[in-house]
Amino acid sequence: MLLKKKRYMFDERDDNNINSPVAVEPSSNNNKMADTREVRIEEQLKVKIGEAKNLSSRNAANTSCSTQGTRDVYCTIALDQEEICRTPTIERTLTPFFGEEHQFKIPRRFRYLTIYLWDRDMKQDKPIGKIAIKREELHMYNHKDHWFSLRPVDQDSEVQGMVNVEVAFTEAQQTQSLSEGIDLGQHTLRHHQNLPHHSHQQRAHLNDYKENSELSNIQRASAAAASSSSAAMTLKTRAAGLFGHVHHPPSQTQHFPIINTTSTSSDQLSNWKSHGRFVGVTIKVPACVDLAKKQGTCDPFVVCTAHYSNKHQVTRRTKQRKKTVDPEFDEAMYFDLHIDADAGSTNTTGSNKSAGSLESSANKGYSIYPVGGADLVEIVVSVWHDAHGAMSDKVFLGEVRLPMLNKQEQQAVNPSAWYYLQPRSMTHSSRSLNATPRSCATPPGTRLSVDSTIGSLRLNLNYTADHVFPLATYDDLMNLLLESVDQRPITVSAVSILGELVSGKTEVAQPLVRLFTHTERIAPIIKALADHEISHLTDPTTIFRGNTLVSKMMDEAMRLSGLHYLHQTLRPVLSQIVAEKKPCEIDPSKIKDRSAVDTNLHNLQDYVERVFEAITKSADRCPKVLCQIFHDLRECAGEHFPSNREVRYSVVSGFIFLRFFAPAILGPKLFDLTTERLDAQTSRTLTLISKTIQSLGNLVSSRSSQQTCKEEFTVELYKKFCTEQHVDAVKHFLEVISTPSHASSSVHPAAAAATPLEPVLLKEGLMTKYPTSRKRFGRQFKQRHFRLTTHSLSYAKSKGKQPICDIPLQEIASVEQLKDKSFKMQNCFKIVHNDRSLIVQTTNCVEEREWFDLLHKICLMNSIRMQYFHPSAFVSGFYSCCGRSDENSPGCKKVLDKTMDYFQMDLVTALDPALDLQRIHTLIMSNMSVLESLLDPLTYHQSLSQTQHQQHNPLVPLATDLQKHSPQAFAEFKRTIEKLREKAYAIDRDHRDYKQGITRQLKYGSRQAPIGDDNYWHMMRAAGQLNQQHHQQQQHQQQQQQQQQQQLQQFQPQPVLPQMQNVRAYPYQPATSNMNAYCLHNMQYQQQRLPFHQQQQQHHQQLQQQQSQFQPLRSHQLQRHNNNLNNNNCGNGSSSSPSSTTSSVVAAPPSTTSSSQPAPPIY
């Protein structure tokens, strides 16, 4: 389909993600780009925390006692410094093993992924160390385990956020006093030069507020002394100038040059204009964004410090802002670019020197102060938190350094720009603004990876960031994938090719399952893939035992469509097991008291019986789409193995028990079955239950009900459950779930479980509520335990208590995000129901995103959904957004009308086909070289001749098999690959144009590309590399075409010699002594009788006559001869030259028959 192209650009939006690009109308030029309204960035992160090693003990004061004592250790995962999740505490160890896996979507912009390692203490938990990895570097560690060195956590390293700094330079006032000063003399000029200085100094004092306690009494006294001495020197200089001479001590020289009275006035005026144009600079910090919190709060203020070349410092600060991480300041702070030399003797940093020592140090002969005064070197803009009641009255939040040493640096400063806050410099000599801080992420194998005195932590990361275009952009690719359902054989389809192309089957299975579930064709595609896989098996016990594409797609389909069925079945019984914490260990080697084995066995049998009963009685609640898939698998297995009746059960139990129920019992947190932290005893209990349930599922595949036990201590356990009664219950369960209903054809497969018999728990957790409708005294923010089910939203004082409030889902009218300035708190949203509102705050941004998405989908389904709302809270008798005093007044902002055409809005699944298609496109582009190698004949022949290439190209065995058995299927296989390449390159062009458009419109120093990080330069470099890669791809394709032509020319016959024009080649026969047997038609006697020149004329005429007649025949004959030479490995290997052709040719018998025709070439 034809798509209208538009240009994309960055635009700041109301939500937290300021890096969200949106499309705007194209400009006057007709540049075509990918379609339409919006391009969104979907980021997802999976973190596996393994183990830590080489941790120092808590009481380790030196190396000798470093092995004494242990720690209680746990980890937290944070985006910048906002904690997202944490691991359980591993007690009394220095080598903790966590084995935790956390996966979540990233809802906002961040700079660093930070993993903290904590030591739990009675008083306060203390950080042992941390790992900070830049967002741009996360992809370097995907899918592999890496050891990272822990870095110390201090106040200077805990920096985050941005600051907006405005810089304005003040020019010297050039009035009529300038010419008067030139005529009257040197003293008058200096008098007028000192006037701006004192006026600006007076303005600077106005910005010094009462709460500015940085200057001590000594500093104030020294500053006053410097001011009075400067005034005295002005009078002294004026008086001396009247008598014709001026004496300048070294410490009192002026910073402006002395104008010679003997020169002309025009020269003096030009020197004045070219020298010292700027006399001061004004710094203003309008806003800061996303500052770090200290002890859960932030009361920021800004301090500006001017550093001069004589080590003099001038400090200004703003007023404090209360309880906000996004403060705004309106103060302007003024600093002189040049100060007098005597001012350099006063140090405002709090030195304890006396006045005499300062004067003596200023009059030393080896002073390094500049002649004429001191220049401004740099201005440090730092942000601080006012911690009242703490040991330190202020906490460092970050700083920005602005160089001001010379005119070049002053002109390089952006008048208004955003800066990333940087850690505090370790030494005062570090004055470089562009100096990047040392990264805390340490790749393995480097010198820094072993240079760690704190310890190391093993992590496995998987970070994905997809730029998702509107669904219309992927229409061609989606249609190509959907055609796979009807293609036969299935191996020539796009889905099968992707399964063989990508090594990680889970990466390609997940988007494929979600895409085909959205189009209601998941059952047919799994049936086609399963039928092809089962047809190539000879042993029924190995069905779906490997990690093939169809096995992974079945795993994803069960988890996608059957997740809430799993919650209904196992959540109640698992909650009891976690809460009761009964010991169930039956291994004698792991129990100190052997008499407790019988009691533990009884507890374990009771738990297994509960779980088994919950599973077998849940067959009626199995989703219809899963019933249809199980039915198709059973029919395919019965068709290929008709003599084996057990295979009809084992093919279903292999998925539902071995790949669904057993893994969910073993790891309930991975399937969202519980949010509790499991201790070692509970984990061991769940492991034993999972093994038993898996063994019960295997009973239907064996001909006897007694199964061999792998461990001796499980004999008594299996005796109770390996009975005919349990086997019949399992078979009945499998029969029911593999029998589809007749009404399933009219019901959406993904929405089959949307009407459960009892409420399904969607989400629960702790949140802070603020009821705006009630008028009460005291604290209104209260922490409550919220539960969201398919029926209602409720909250109670704690988990398990009676709900205080229960809101039916039908009564929820609107859910919208709030501005952070309403309560000066983050992660808040408003729930409106029955003309009342409830404001809720979550613990972090990820929780806010999950709760908001679920409630927003419910509101989209409600008929009473509101159209307008108030984006702010009703505080102090009015709405801060619109100023209305009536609490029941209609909203002032329209509810976001998000078109969810390509989203399936139900409570079971929320599918996003555009995101899934983008992930598939990313997989295709990452493996494009493998696809193109199959379309290149030269590379394909090399991969066939060398076995090493088959390991790098997984499609070569499939292509060889298709070429051998079915040339038509092989041709269809090539056409599918060409279509995949064509569709992928079309989408890639849209991505390239989009990124180039962003790069052209992005400004360095804006809020989207702040100064102080290399993100902008990475983007610029990436945009340049996109063009370069595009040109390289075109050049590579041209080179491949040239190589193909050269290769084909080598295979084509060489120009035939004049003596060989009528030579016909015949294949080798065993009866013939000469392999190169040619037949020459009556040419020898004519060449012997005719003169040489007549032979040439006659030969030339014959060539012209026979060229059009024998050219096709000659080409066919010579090609068949070359093929025969390749098929026959014996012979003389002799060649005929033009002079010896007549003597080397031997006539072949005309009755010779040709050999079997070889296989046709690929191209």
UniProtKB/Swiss-Prot annotation:
Q: Which GO terms describe its cellular component?
A: plasma membrane
Q: Note down the stretches annotated as region Disordered.
A: 1026-1051, 1091-1163
Start and end residues of each Btk-type zinc finger? 862-898
What is the reported tissue distribution?
A: In third instar larvae eye imaginal disk, expressed in cells posterior to the morphogenetic furrow, in all photoreceptor and cone cell precursors as well as in still uncommitted cells.
Can you give the residue ranges of the PH domain?
762-860
Any one Gene Ontology MF annotation carried by this entry is: zinc ion binding
CDD domains registered for this protein in UniProt: C2A_RasA2_RasA3, C2B_RasA3, PH_GAP1-like, RasGAP_GAP1_like
Sites where the protein binds Zn(2+): 870, 881-882, 892
List the SUPFAM superfamilies hit by this protein, alphabetically: C2 domain (Calcium/lipid-binding domain, CaLB), GTPase activation domain, GAP, PH domain-like
* Site (Arginine finger) location in chain: 545
Print the keywords alphabetically: GTPase activation, Metal-binding, Repeat, Zinc, Zinc-finger
Biological role: Inhibitory regulator of the Ras-cyclic AMP pathway. May function as a negative regulator of Ras85D/Ras1 in the sev signaling pathway. Acts cell autonomously in cone cell precursors as a negative regulator of R7 photoreceptor cell determination.
Recorded protein name is GTPase-activating protein
Q: What is the scientific name of the source organism?
A: Drosophila melanogaster (Fruit fly)
Q: Which gene underlies this protein? A: RasGAP1
